[in-house]
């Protein structure tokens, strides 16, 4: 970088400074809007009692039911925890596998490199005539809009919608995860495809490859590592989402956690929390080992 | 030629672990879909279809448009009333919750990140041999990292639910604190990585000049790591807005509160309208955060 370009640019510190100042002002305004009182952030008399109970529960998570009003046919607590954990994973696996299909299809169709035909890209639009190109551009735009809309509604809100439309069925939980996750995967996949190095693409084009084959052999293998690492990371998120779907009546871990908390059985709450933490921790370990092997640096 | 290709193919990098992971993933997926654990067929049953048709053709249609009295002006004023009244108020509250939460998360992660970074939290910071350190330093890093793992593994929704029982429902703190703790832990981890990946040269020269740990942090680590950190920060802001919307369903007054309210009253038309409003807010936050990131990178 030469001296002129350095002088022509404003210093990066001032840019950050402006952003931070804006952020501070926004936070102050938001604080005032919400009317937050710092004293309310600490528990009151009753809250302290609950907090004490809750923290005591952390040291001695329940291994059997805490209450005495357990129905005779209820499974042992640990079996119930294992079942809830298993169903949490089942919903997450089903939701993520569906969203992977959506993510790959929409991610390809949403990637600029799938459509455009300037020098660096592999073109599907390249050989089409002008009116066809306009139609294809419209398809590209509508795919991107669809991705944004799928992503912009939280999985819990999709669940609420699907509960109203379909009622309580495990398939509605799966779709509630699959739609927003499909959108997120599609967005990230298309960005990864557009941003991955173009060297292979260039050499393939130089030896005469065109169109989809450049995409499939030049671009996809370069982005594949990042894409699979990200997909696995999303699985971890899907497990968390699946867990909280239980708050809406699905039989995942959130359902039992909520029941126990509402009955003030905090030792049982901790059993569920520890189970969820162990599962997520295990997945995180797995995901980081996988990332080290598949992500190209 | 083909012999050479075959040899290259055989010599490609492979990993047993990756293959085993893919196999486990594939088997689990096949099992989940084939075993009947997910009732995909039930989706097509007559009762569900009926429910779906009723939802689409009656429940979700704005009520002034239902049946005989097709009243477009009425629908318009109904939408204006819902969106302009509680909709607007809840939208402002949602964004405000997310903003306060992300600011607190920023402060929290600023405290945690240096404590978790192996290059700083050690008795001889930023020196070439840094990284190990006495057991006390190692224990400190381990505790901070473990705490962050726990905080980011518990979903915000569960955190807010538990905080609601402790703090009471009459203010926004349960939602704000849940988001701040969860995101503070995530940003703390990312910040610690940003600190560890810093170019060691400038920091070592500060150390060579005799700077203390605190001055190295203030004059070297924070300014240098801030750029990368802020990129993550604005990315998390978007997620915060998304989550702030739904935390309302627990009883804090954000958009989710009114969505839950409409749902409980079976006003599905109003519920859809509010969900649409939530979608607009999230898209707006997405736009703001991507603009902020672009501004950081290139100044536009």
Positions of predicted regions on the chain:
Chain B
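Transmembrane alpha-helix boundary and packing residues in multipass membrane permease domains
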Residues: 114, 161-165, 232, 244-248, ...
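C-terminal transmembrane helix and the adjacent membrane-cytosol boundary/short C-terminal tail
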Residues: 231, 272-300
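Membrane-cytosol interface at the C-terminal ends of specific transmembrane alpha-helices
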Residues: 162-165, 169-221, 227-236, 287-290
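Generic hydrophobic transmembrane alpha-helix motif, especially the helices
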Residues: 128-180
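Alpha-helical membrane-protein architecture signal
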Residues: 80, 84, 88, 92, ...
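N-terminal, non-cleaved signal-anchor transmembrane helix
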Residues: 1-103, 107, 111, 115-142, ...
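Loop-to-transmembrane-helix entry motif
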Residues: 12-16, 86, 90, 94-102, ...
